[in-house]
Amino acid sequence: MAHRCLLLWSRGGCRRGLPPLLVPRGCLGPDRRPCLRTLYQYATVQTASSRRSLLRDVIAAYQRFCSRPPKGFEKYFPNGKNGKKASEPKEAVGEKKEPQPSGPQPSGGAGGGGGKRRGKKEDSHWWSRFQKGDFPWDDKDFRMYFLWTALFWGGVMIYFVFKSSGREITWKDFVNNYLSKGVVDRLEVVNKRFVRVTFTPGKTPVDGQYVWFNIGSVDTFERNLETLQQELGIEGENRVPVVYIAESDGSFLLSMLPTVLIIAFLLYTIRRGPAGIGRTGRGMGGLFSVGETTAKVLKDEIDVKFKDVAGCEEAKLEIMEFVNFLKNPKQYQDLGAKIPKGAILTGPPGTGKTLLAKATAGEANVPFITVSGSEFLEMFVGVGPARVRDLFALARKNAPCILFIDEIDAVGRKRGRGNFGGQSEQENTLNQLLVEMDGFNTTTNVVILAGTNRPDILDPALLRPGRFDRQIFIGPPDIKGRASIFKVHLRPLKLDSALEKDKLARKLASLTPGFSGADVANVCNEAALIAARHLSDAINEKHFEQAIERVIGGLEKKTQVLQPEEKKTVAYHEAGHAVAGWYLEHADPLLKVSIIPRGKGLGYAQYLPKEQYLYTKEQLLDRMCMTLGGRVSEEIFFGRITTGAQDDLRKVTQSAYAQIVQFGMNEKVGQISFDLPRQGDMVLEKPYSEATARMIDDEVRILISDAYRRTVALLTEKKADVEKVALLLLEKEVLDKNDMVQLLGPRPFTEKSTYEEFVEGTGSLDEDTSLPEGLQDWNKEREKEEKKEKEKEEPLNEKVVS
């Protein structure tokens, strides 16, 4: 700035002369021309330099502005978002880059793939993350926006709370206190809703607030004001002027706030939606992501191992072999074998299909993708096929992997049962599933497992080899399998010190014929709950017996009130069952009989069925007679029958129809077999004629009548025994096998009751859990193991040579 002032002075722009302080010493004489010339030259040089500096700054700013890449195109510019910045140091010549780790990145967990399906969190803008349902509180910009928004709306609220709103008066107060006293300067009609009174200078009220009053309509106000001023004698220029103004008091902002909040909530809900909850980072969510799969990618997140699965060793071997296919394919490819595409696990509920899949996920050491069959179908058309495509695309990205579809019958039902909307969508989803499993776009290194307990309703195209090469049936465990399952579930329990786990597991296995793995787990859990209920320090054998009774018979109802006559009827009914079974050769051995109500029944009898898979006609007939023993006992001792035998009659009827319709055990109907309808199935037509149906009904009635007459004859002969058992039941309420032996003597037929007797002749006491030689290292990659062994052997060989 100084050199500019000097230049201005030297050109005559300053008439007052050069300030003395700016003149060098020795130049204050009369001849100041050399000094002025020096100063002029200095000022000229400095001005030119400043102009060049200013121009240089402008050009540099323009270049920086032009070099900034457009938003969204940063990666196409060398110094853009992905390019190397000028401030970053260049790599030295000859310096080698460190290799990037090629190992598998950590999975995002069970939320649908995690890191495999999303970008880095720090690279994403906070608004994009907020759209995807992620609340970006860790973002600095988001916190600043949130803070300023909160301050803005807080200021608005404070403004409206503390804003002076004046003092409201009535029309009468306005006339008497203000207009009649001549203190009104003018009236302002605001928004045609109220009138603000402006006072003449010096006449303002003491409180300093303005006053206002409401008006109904402008016309009425003007008419009343005109009449009032005439009455008060206010004429001409002295009349109060009326001004009409329109003001915005900001109340519309508050009125719009609920609407804005509702719209924001709806947009957030639509973008995230039910399908997007817990799946942040997978697209926009909600309606915009219905075509995305809801599958979960699991790896090293399941605690269930194969040691926790028992009672289905054959199925375990099959699943281990599938994992071995993925880990060591060379073992099979060298022999020309192809890796199977998949396997479907079938069997009754509770036998361990899903548990086996969980164990596979826990030990496979490959990505495990799980999805439910019902997750493919939604209310939108086309969602099912889209999710199937996305599911298999996810599987290909994670190959080699295992894909598990639980309850596949939800999407794999047979086609051709009508062309309704839902059925058509289900068929389209099934068609897409068939194409993805074995079509032109065949997946590689992806093993597909599926589970269902209704294989009879699956489409045949789904079950053919090439899609599901193997069908693995997992049935209820036998006595050895139950013993193994009990050992697994007894492991974490605190048992009494006098109990041995192996012996206890075998005894419980012999007491629970027909139990599935889920039933066994329930028994162990119930025993622990019963022990805790009684504040026991450990679980003893009595607790397990009570748990078995709880699972079989239901909850014991000791407080249920029975009339003495009803209790007596129940006692004779249960005594009839017990005595009939005691003297019938093929009936199941009795363990316990009780007249304490359990579940829906008023009495309870526990038997020990034999562990067998084939039944003769004589065995089925003896079981029918034992079941009818309760009704026969009522008729013999009371001369009447009650409704208590309804469940017994239902079981007898089912057994009779099964013998005649399914098993071909009737000479008149012949050696034929028809499928009986399942409970709850709609039967439109029978597979046989009306004449055959009439014949079947007649033979069923004859068979049941013969069994009833046989039971009547037996209990009439053993009437005294029935009465002894009934009287003791009324006295003790619960009888076990020892009580029956004391009353009736030993049972006249041989029977099996211990674990060792049941497994006699089967080769061993426990189930065979040995693995074939090819599956000894089923969970290890042999090539890597061999390389490690060679690397260990090489240094040893070098030492030996040296």
UniProtKB/Swiss-Prot annotation:
Transit peptide: 1-38
Keyword Transferase (UniProt): no
Record-annotated active site: 574
One BP term from GO: protein autoprocessing
UniProt-listed InterPro entries: AAA+_ATPase, AAA_lid_3, ATP-dep_Zn_Metalloprotease, ATPase_AAA_core, ATPase_AAA_CS, FtsH, P-loop_NTPase, Pept_M41_FtsH_extracell
Highest taxon, organism lineage: Eukaryota
Cellular component, GO, one term: m-AAA complex
Propeptide residue span(s): 39-66
Modification after translation (UniProt): Upon import into the mitochondrion, the N-terminal transit peptide is cleaved to generate an intermediate form which undergoes autocatalytic proteolytic processing to generate the proteolytically active mature form.
Localisation per UniProt entry: Mitochondrion inner membrane
Cofactor descriptive note: Binds 1 zinc ion per subunit.
Disordered as annotated region, ranges: 76-124, 759-802
Cofactor or coenzyme needed: Zn(2+)
A molecular-function term among this protein's GO annotations: zinc ion binding
Modified residues (N6-succinyllysine): 116
Assembly and binders: Homohexamer. Forms heterohexamers with SPG7 and AFG3L1. The m-AAA protease is either composed of homohexamers of AFG3L2 or heterohexamers of AFG3L1, AFG3L2 and/or SPG7. Interacts with MAIP1. Interacts with DNAJC19. Interacts with PHB2.
Disease cited in the entry: Defects in Afg3l2 are the cause of the paralyze (par) phenotype, a spontaneous mutant strain. Par mice have a normal appearance and fertility but are significantly smaller than their littermates at 1 week of age and display a rapidly progressive loss of motor function in all limbs by 12-14 days. As the disease progresses, they lose the ability to support their own weight or turn themselves over when placed on their back and exhibit a typical posture with over extension of all limbs and uncoordinated movements. They rarely survive beyond 16 days of age, when they are completely paralyzed.
NCBIfam families from the UniProt entry: FtsH_fam
Protein name in UniProt: Mitochondrial inner membrane m-AAA protease component AFG3L2
